Curated annotation (Swiss-Prot):
Pfam families: CADH_Y-type_LIR, Cadherin, Cadherin_pro. Residues 1-23 form the signal peptide. Residues 815-886 are annotated as: Required for binding alpha, beta and. One of its GO terms (cellular component) is cytoplasm. Residues 751-771 are annotated as: Disordered. Three calcium ions are usually bound at the interface of each cadherin domain and strengthen the connections, imparting a strong curvature to the full-length ectodomain. Residues 735-886 are cytoplasmic. The chain crosses the membrane at residues 714-734. Residues 762-773 are annotated as: Required for binding CTNND1 and PSEN1. This is Cadherin-1. It comes from Rattus norvegicus. Residues 24-158 form a propeptide. InterPro entries: Cadherin, Cadherin-like_dom, Cadherin-like_sf, Cadherin_CS, Cadherin_pro_dom, Cadherin_Y-type_LIR, Catenin-bd_sf.
Length: 886
C-alpha cells in the first residue's frame, strides 16, 4: 500500500512551503494578507499534446475567509482550477507555442478580485512522458509534519494546506492499511498524541480512516468507492499528555483515485433519427450518447469511444452510415438512400471506455429515411368530360385521379391542381385529402348564352417542390354547359328615383324594367310589386311603369328611413320553369313644408310659490329650411298669466313661466308656433299649478278628476244611480209579494141562485126559465190569474177576448171566438182544469134531465162534435162518450 500511496513531489512542495514560512518575520505572521503565494506560476509540460485530465500543478491563495477551499476562475477555458488550486486540462489540446500563459482569479473576504499568472513551458518531444514526475498525483508523502514556528506554541493565522493524499478505490488486501504518518516536531520535547476529525473519521461515514494515537500513522479501514465519495477532508490534531494542543489542526485531503469499475451506459436503449432519401455523404443523421460513472478527468476510465457493430439491411451498401468515435454523431457515409426501397435502417452501436479498449455496452439506432418529392403525380386517365347547368356555383363537374409513389399523406404526396387556361377563374379544383383526387367544380356561374363548351387543361404538382427535373402531369377536361331558364335581370339592380313627398296620386314615378337573359328563347315578362309596406305604389304589369296610388309622407318613420322609401319589384317570365328576378326601387322623398312645429312637453306642473320656469322644446319633423328658427306667440289671452321667451339663439326652445302668483288649479295655454316658412299651428298646453314652492316634487293640486268634473257633480250622479237601483229593487220585491186571490171554480153548496133551481125528483118539465148570461164569463174573464214561477217570464201579447154580446143569438159566435183566444193563451190553465158553466142556453136538446137515458140510437149519444170546439172539450167527450152502461 505504501508505494502506491506516496507522492514525492507533494512532499517536496510541502517542505518548500514549510521552509518559506520559517523564514518569515514574526510581524508578518501576526496579520492575514489575502493574495496568491506567487505572482507568477510556471509549470513544465513534457510535450505539446496534452490529454484531458492532465494535472499541470497547483496555485495557492489565502483569502482570509477562514475557509480551506477557494473558488478559482481561469481565463483560458481549456484549463480548470479546482477549489484546492489544482490546475488540470479540460479537453485534449495542442500547445502551438513553447510558452502558454493565462490568468487565474480568486476573491478575498471583501470580494476583491486577485489574480496570478500561470505559464506553461513545453519541454519538447524529446522528453518522453514517463520521465516526467507529476508534482501532485504520483505518490503520497510517507511522512507529514506539522509546521514549525520560531516563537513557541502559537495558533497560526492561516490554514496549513498540504497536497492531497491519493488512495485507489476498490483496494484489496488486509485492512487497515497505512496511508501516511503524521508527526509533530515537538515529539522530542513532550509526549504527543495524534487524532483525526472530519467526515470519514468521527463523522459519517464514521471509521473509514483511523490514526494510531502514539505513532500518528493514518490508516484506511475498508475499500473505498470513488463513485460514492471521491474526496475526504480530514483534520489532524496533536496534543500533549495533559491534553494541551501542541500543534494547530492540519488539513489532510484524501483523494480516492478511480479504477475502471463501471461500464458505459447509453442514455436510451433505442435512439431514433431520420434522414432524407438521396442524402449526400457527410449528412448528419443523429447522435447517440453514453455516460460512465468513472473519473473522466484524471483517467481514461470514462473516455468513451463509439463504433457501429452492424447495419440492417445491408443494402444497397454494407456501410451506409458511420459514427464519430468521440461525439457519437451518426452520419451518411455512402450515397444511395431510397425510401421507396429501404425506408428504415437499424444500427447496433457500441460504446466502450478506455477510449474503446475497456468495458463496453450497446444500443440500437433506428434511422428512418424521409421521403423527398422525387416522384411526380401522374393523371390516370388523362382525359375527362363533364357537364354543368348554367349559373350553378360549386357544381361538381369531374373527379381527376392521380398516382404518386411518394409516401402518402406527406407534402411530397399531397396533390395541388391548377387550371391552366382559366383567366377568369371560373373553375376550381379541390384536393380530396384522403384519396388525393382532384374535384373539379365551378367557381362562378357559367352563361350558356355566352359560351356552350369549355376545354380545360389541368396540371398537378405536390405541396413540396419537385426534386430534380420532374415535369408536372397534365389532363384535358371538356365541360359542356346546359341551358336553363334564367330569371329576368333588372337594369339597374337598384334604381334610385327622387320625388317630392307631395308628388300626388296616380302620377307616373318611373319605368323600371328587366331584360331577359335567355336570348335563344322568346319569353314574355310581367311585373308586380313584391314589397310595398306603405301601399303607396302600383305598377303596370306589362310595361313596368310605376305610379303612386296614395299620398306619400317623408315623415312616416315606420316606412321611410333617411328620407328613402324602399320597394321591391319582381319580374316573372313565362318559361319552364317560371323564373323570377328582383329589383330594388329607392324613392328619395324630398321634403315639403307640410308639418307645423309642435311643443314638447304639453303637460307641465308649476308650484304656486316661487315657481321654476319650464323649458319647452319645439319639434318639427320637416327638414331645413322648413324648420328653425321658430316663432312663438301666446294667444287667446294666455299672455295675461304667462310669459314665454326664447331659450337659445336658434329659437328651437322656449322658457315658459307665470307672470304672477296663480291660484291652484288647471290652466289651458294656447301657444302658436310658426316655422321658418310661416307654417303655424296653435297647440294647447295643460298646466297644473300645485300647492308647493320652487321645484315640483309632489304636486298638491285641487281634487278633481281628469275628465274635468267637480266633486259635487260626481256625487250627484252617483246618488241618482243609487236611487234608481233602490227603486228597481223595491218594484221587484213588490211584484214577488203580490197576493193573488183565486175564486173557486164551483160555487159553495149553500150558494143561493136567484134563477137556478134544483130538483130532487124526476118527472115534469124543467122549471128554470130565467137564466143569467153573465155567468158564462167565469171561465174566461173571471178566471184566476195563473203565473208560472218555474221559468223566466216571456214578453208576449195578451189574448183579446170578445165581450159578451147583447143579442143572445150571437152567443155561438161569442163562444167560438173566445174559445180560439183561450186556445192560444199561453197563460191558460191546463186542459184538464174544471170549468163551471151555470147557463146552458136556450134551445137545449135535453127537454128534461130525466130524458138523458132515453136515447134510442147511437146517433143520439155521439159527442164527437165536441172535438170541433177544441182540446178543452175533448176531455168532456171522452167522459160522456165512453159507451153504453153494462
Amino acid at each position: 500500500m505504501g508505494a502506491r500511496c506516496r507522492s514525492f513531489s507533494a512532499l517536496l512542495l510541502l517542505l518548500q512551503v514549510s521552509s518559506w514560512l520559517c523564514q518569515q518575520p514574526e510581524s508578518e505572521s501576526d496579520s492575514c494578507r489575502p493574495g496568491f503565494s506567487s505572482e507568477v506560476y510556471t509549470f513544465l509540460v513534457p510535450e505539446r499534446h496534452l490529454e484531458r485530465g492532465h494535472i499541470l500543478g497547483r496555485v495557492k491563495f489565502e483569502g482570509c475567509t477562514g475557509r480551506p477551499r477557494t473558488a478559482f476562475f481561469s481565463e483560458d477555458s481549456r484549463f480548470k482550477v479546482s477549489t484546492d488550486g489544482v490546475i488540470t486540462v479540460k479537453r485534449h489540446l495542442k500547445l502551438h507555442k513553447l510558452e502558454t500563459s493565462f490568468l487565474v482569479h480568486a476573491w478575498d473576504s471583501s470580494y476583491r478580485k486577485l489574480s496570478t499568472k500561470v505559464t506553461l513551458k513545453s519541454l519538447g518531444h524529446h522528453h518522453h512522458r514517463h520521465h516526467h514526475r507529476d508534482p501532485v498525483s504520483e505518490s503520497n508523502p510517507e511522512l507529514l509534519t506539522f509546521p514549525s514556528f520560531h516563537q513557541g506554541l502559537r495558533r497560526q493565522k492561516r490554514d496549513w494546506v498540504i497536497p492531497p493524499i491519493n488512495c485507489p478505490e476498490n483496494q484489496k488486501g488486509e485492512f487497515p492499511q497505512r496511508l501516511v504518518q503524521i508527526k509533530s516536531n515537538r515529539d522530542k520535547e513532550t509526549t504527543v498524541f495524534y487524532s483525526i476529525t472530519g467526515p470519514g473519521a468521527d463523522k459519517p461515514p464514521v471509521g473509514v480512516f483511523i490514526i494510531e494515537r502514539e505513532t500518528g500513522w493514518l490508516k484506511v479501514t475498508q475499500p473505498l468507492d470513488r463513485e460514492a465519495i471521491d474526496k475526504y477532508l480530514l483534520y489532524s490534531h496533536a496534543v500533549s499528555s495533559n491534553g494541551e494542543a501542541v500543534e494547530d489542526p492540519m488539513e489532510i485531503v484524501v483523494t480516492v483515485t478511480d479504477q475502471n469499475d463501471n461500464r458505459p451506459e447509453f442514455i436510451q436503449e433505442v435512439f431514433e433519427g431520420s434522414v432524407a432519401e438521396g442524402a449526400l455523404p457527410g449528412t448528419s443523421v443523429m447522435q447517440v450518447s453514453a455516460t460512465d460513472a468513472d473519473d473522466d478527468i484524471n483517467t481514461y476510465n470514462a473516455a468513451i469511444a463509439y463504433t457501429i457493430l452492424s447495419q440492417d439491411p445491408e443494402l444497397p451498401h454494407k456501410n451506409m452510415f458511420t459514427v464519430n468515435r468521440d461525439t457519437g454523431v451518426i452520419s451518411v457515409v455512402t450515397s444511395g438512400l431510397d425510401r421507396e426501397s429501404y425506408p428504415t435502417y437499424t444500427l447496433v452501436v457500441q460504446a466502450a471506455d478506455l477510449q474503446g479498449e475497456g468495458l463496453s455496452t450497446t444500443a440500437k439506432a433506428v434511422i428512418t429515411v424521409k421521403d423527398i418529392n422525387d416522384n411526380a403525380p401522374i393523371f390516370n386517365p388523362s382525359t375527362y368530360q363533364g357537364q354543368v347547368l348554367e349559373n350553378e356555383v360549386g357544381a361538381r363537374i369531374a373527379t381527376l385521379k392521380v398516382t404518386d409513389d411518394d409516401a402518402p399523406n406527406t407534402p411530397a404526396w399531397n396533390a395541388v391542381y391548377t387550371v391552366v387556361n382559366d383567366p377568369d377563374h371560373q373553375f376550381t379544383v379541390i384536393t380530396d385529402p384522403k384519396t388525393n383526387e382532384g374535384i373539379l367544380k365551378t367557381a362562378k356561374g357559367l352563361d350558356f348564352e355566352a359560351k356552350q363548351q369549355y376545354i380545360l387543361h389541368v396540371t398537378v404538382e405536390n405541396e413540396e417542390p419537385f426534386e430534380g427535373s420532374l415535369v408536372p402531369s397534365t389532363a384535358t377536361v371538356t365541360v359542356d354547359v346546359v341551358d336553363v331558364n334564367e330569371a329576368p335581370i333588372f337594369v339597374p339592380a337598384e334604381k334610385r328615383v327622387e320625388v317630392p313627398e307631395d308628388f300626388g296620386v296616380g302620377l307616373e314615378i318611373a319605368s323600371y324594367t328587366a331584360r331577359e337573359p335567355d336570348t335563344f328563347m322568346e319569353q314574355k315578362i310581367t311585373y308586380r310589386i313584391w314589397r310595398d309596406t306603405a301601399n303607396w305604389l302600383e305598377i303596370n304589369p306589362e310595361t313596368g311603369v310605376i305610379s303612386t296610388r296614395a299620398e306619400m309622407d317623408r315623415e312616416d318613420s315606420e316606412h321611410v328611413k333617411n328620407s328613402t322609401y324602399t320597394a321591391l319589384i319582381i319580374a316573372t317570365d313565362d318559361g319552364s320553369p317560371i323564373a323570377t328576378g328582383t329589383g330594388t326601387l329607392l324613392l328619395v322623398l324630398s321634403d315639403v313644408n307640410d308639418n307645423a312645429p309642435i311643443p314638447e312637453p304639453r303637460n307641465m306642473q308649476f308650484c304656486q310659490r316661487n315657481p321654476k320656469p319650464h323649458v319647452i322644446t319645439i319639434l318639427d319633423p320637416d327638414l331645413p329650411p322648413n324648420t328653425s328658427p321658430f316663432t312663438a306667440e301666446l294667444t287667446h289671452g294666455a299672455s295675461v298669466n304667462w310669459t314665454i321667451e326664447y331659450n337659445d339663439a336658434e329659437q328651437e326652445s322656449l322658457i315658459l313661466q307665470p307672470r304672477k302668483d296663480l291660484e291652484i288649479g288647471e290652466y289651458k295655454i294656447n301657444l302658436k308656433l310658426s316655422d321658418n316658412q310661416n307654417k303655424d299651428q296653435v297647440t294647447t298646453l295643460e298646466v297644473h299649478v300645485c300647492d308647493c314652492e320652487g321645484t315640483v316634487n309632489n304636486c298638491m293640486k285641487a281634487i278633481s278628476l281628469e275628465a274635468g268634473l267637480q266633486v259635487p257633480a260626481i256625487l250627484g250622479i252617483l246618488g241618482g244611480i243609487l236611487a234608481l237601483l233602490i227603486l228597481i229593487l223595491l218594484l221587484l220585491l213588490f211584484l214577488r209579494r203580490r197576493t193573488v186571490v183565486k175564486e173557486p171554480l164551483l160555487p159553495p153548496d149553500d150558494d143561493t141562485r136567484d134563477n137556478v133551481y134544483y130538483y130532487d125528483e124526476e118527472g115534469g118539465g124543467e122549471e128554470d126559465q130565467d137564466f143569467d148570461l153573465s155567468q158564462l164569463h167565469r171561465g174566461l174573464d173571471a178566471r184566476p190569474e195563473v203565473i208560472r214561477n218555474d221559468v223566466a217570464p216571456t214578453l208576449m201579447s195578451m189574448p183579446q177576448y170578445r165581450p159578451r154580446p147583447a143579442n143572445p143569438d150571437e152567443i155561438g159566435n161569442f163562444i167560438d171566438e173566445n174559445l180560439k183566444a183561450a186556445d192560444s193563451d199561453p197563460t191558460a190553465p191546463p186542459y184538464d182544469s174544471l170549468l163551471v158553466f151555470d147557463y146552458e142556453g136556450s134551445g137545449s136538446e135535453a127537454a128534461s134531465l130525466s130524458s138523458l137515458n132515453s136515447s134510442e140510437s147511437d146517433q143520439d149519444q155521439d159527442y164527437d162534435y165536441l172535438n170541433e170546439w177544441g182540446n178543452r172539450f175533448k176531455k168532456l167527450a171522452d167522459m160522456y162518450g165512453g159507451g153504453e152502461e153494462d
